[in-house]
From Swiss-Prot:
Listed InterPro entries: NADH_UbQ_OxRdtase-like_20kDa (IPR006137), NADH_UQ_OxRdtase_20Kd_su (IPR006138)
Lineage of the species this protein comes from: Bacteria, Pseudomonadati, Aquificota, Aquificia, Aquificales
Keywords of the record: 4Fe-4S, Cell inner membrane, Cell membrane, Iron, Iron-sulfur, Membrane, Metal-binding, NAD, Quinone, Translocase, Transport, Ubiquinone
Function of the molecule: NDH-1 shuttles electrons from NADH, via FMN and iron-sulfur (Fe-S) centers, to quinones in the respiratory chain. Couples the redox reaction to proton translocation (for every two electrons transferred, four hydrogen ions are translocated across the cytoplasmic membrane), and thus conserves the redox energy in a proton gradient.
Main location: membrane
Gene Ontology molecular-function annotations: 4 iron, 4 sulfur cluster binding; iron ion binding; NADH dehydrogenase (ubiquinone) activity; NADH:ubiquinone reductase (non-electrogenic) activity; quinone binding
Family classification: Belongs to the complex I 20 kDa subunit family.
Species for this entry: Aquifex aeolicus (strain VF5)
Location in the cell: Cell inner membrane
Name used for this protein in its record: NADH-quinone oxidoreductase subunit B
EC id: 7.1.1.-
Membrane topology, from the record: Peripheral membrane protein
Length: 179
């Protein structure tokens, strides 16, 4: 809840401030495995410009909070994909881009993973073969909406404790400084 008081100051909660920051500065790491990766690169270029949405691609999973899997995932790549997912700090989200990443695509074989959601949790599915840049942008907007609505669930207890402390004391004072 954001409110503006009579002096023109904006007041909000720490939780809402962090939600706003998280959803407006998504840093994805990409797993580009097929033709979907070409469309993803096209989306990041000047015509569609993902930077205007706060999306800045990262080279390291340790600096990213979104994993975009674009293309066919074969069984030999699956352990590496899981490792990349595990290296990402929490909170983290996953976008499955295209029919191949979402359900195996036209490759129902023993060597193809029939959906990324079999090894990591997926937050947004983007259909298409390959999806258009507009589809990827729509998927990112859906992820931003999801972050706004759900918040950062892992830290909900921390926010609840913090907000209770503020309400109890009237102002936040670190526990070790209380007299």
């Amino acid at each position: 809840m954001v409110a503006i008081n009579s002096n023109g100051f904006v007041t909000t909660t720490v939780e809402e401030l962090l939600r706003w920051g998280r959803r407006n500065s998504l840093w994805p790491v990409t797993i580009g495995l097929a033709c979907c990766a070409i469309e993803m690169m096209h989306t990041a270029a000047s015509r569609f410009d993902l930077d205007r949405l706060g999306v800045i691609f990262r080279a390291s999973p340790r600096q990213a909070d979104v994993l975009i899997v674009a293309g066919t995932v074969v069984n030999k790549v699956a352990p590496m994909l899981k490792l990349i997912w595990d290296q990402m700090p929490d909170p983290k989200w996953c976008i499955s881009m295209g029919g191949c990443a979402s359900a195996g695509g036209p490759f129902p074989t023993y060597s193809t993973l029939q959906g990324v959601d079999r090894i990591i949790p997926v937050d947004v599915y983007i259909p298409g073969c390959p999806p258009t840049p507009q589809g990827l942008i729509y998927g990112i907007l859906q992820l931003q909406r999801k972050i706004k609505e759900q918040g950062i669930t892992k830290y909900d207890k921390l926010f609840a404790d913090f907000n209770r402390e503020i309400e109890k004391e009237g102002i936040f004072v670190p526990r070790e400084l209380k007299v």
